[in-house]
Amino acid sequence: MSEIPFWQSKTLDEMTDVQWESLCDGCGQCCLHKLMDEDSDEIYFTNVACKQLNIKTCQCRNYERRFEYEPDCIKLTRDNLPTFEWLPHTCAYRLLAEGKGLPTWHPLLTGSKVEMHGERISVRHIAVKESEVQDWEDHILNHPKRA
């Protein structure tokens, strides 16, 4: 008899920190800069990557110290999860909070990020370095459901 995976047997609140962190598929979509319209508060998504994002691997270069390097970096927690409506529809945190399952390409199911990159879920195919961008408004995207 096989053991039920933790994401099916526990609520987000019941997960350990290690389990919580492992839900992140590493797509890098959280690490793309967003712009907010000052009049409407509407959020616009760009393909401009945070300076700390390694675009090839879609990993933070300084994850443990990211807030020192990027004070505006977000920390997704169990408490603030409901406030991040902009999370991608493929995000495990969002899906589990909505009572849905993980997508078939998720690294917890496949054992690697290969399928996620192959499905073009990650930002590696669309992200540009912040240092190479002059006008962020030229890099506004629709919500990156599929990068």
From Swiss-Prot:
Classification from the root reads:
Bacteria, Pseudomonadati, Pseudomonadota, Gammaproteobacteria, Enterobacterales
Recorded hits in InterPro entries, A to Z, give: Puta_zinc/iron-chelating_dom, UCP006173
Provide the species name: Enterobacter sp. (strain 638)
Name of this chain's protein: UPF0260 protein Ent638_2368
Taxonomic superkingdom: Bacteria
For this chain, the family text in UniProt reads: Belongs to the UPF0260 family.
